[in-house]
Curated annotation (Swiss-Prot):
Enhances virion budding, by targeting human CD4 and Tetherin/BST2 to proteasome degradation. Degradation of CD4 prevents any unwanted premature interactions between viral Env and its receptor human CD4 in the endoplasmic reticulum. Degradation of antiretroviral protein Tetherin/BST2 is important for virion budding, as BST2 tethers new viral particles to the host cell membrane. Mechanistically, Vpu bridges either CD4 or BST2 to BTRC, a substrate recognition subunit of the Skp1/Cullin/F-box protein E3 ubiquitin ligase, induces their ubiquitination and subsequent proteasomal degradation. GO terms for cellular component: host cell membrane; membrane. The keyword Transmembrane helix applies. The gene is vpu. Ion channel activity is inhibited by hexamethylene amiloride in vitro. Residues 1-13 are extracellular. It comes from Simian immunodeficiency virus (isolate TAN1) (SIV-cpz). This is Protein Vpu. Phosphorylated by host CK2. This phosphorylation is necessary for interaction with host BRCP and degradation of CD4, but not for enhancement of virion budding.
Length: 83
């Protein structure tokens, strides 16, 4: 067991309680900060998903057509392939 030599017992107990209070408070602040950042990240993800859905609905282009258009190579363009 650790023996604390300096000061009285009540002073040592109060000091230990203060240290514990500071550590617990700091841990709570860090936890709250992490929770807020996670919630903010979830909100950003929701906004991006809504935007992607809205853009895909508004464009009127199917995903297969988008895929084919992204693979379009003007140097090897054959109009019969696209009819």
């Amino acid at each position: 067991m650790i023996k604390i030599v300096v000061g009285s017992v009540s002073t040592n107990v109060i000091g230990i309680l203060c240290i514990l209070l500071i550590l617990i408070g700091g841990g709570l602040l860090i936890g709250i900060g992490i929770r807020r950042e996670l919630e903010r990240e979830r909100q950003h993800q929701r906004v991006l998903e809504r935007l992607a859905r809205r853009l895909s609905i508004d464009s009127g282009v199917e995903e297969d057509e988008e895929f084919n258009w992204n693979n379009f190579d003007p140097h090897n363009y054959n109009p019969r392939d696209w009819i």
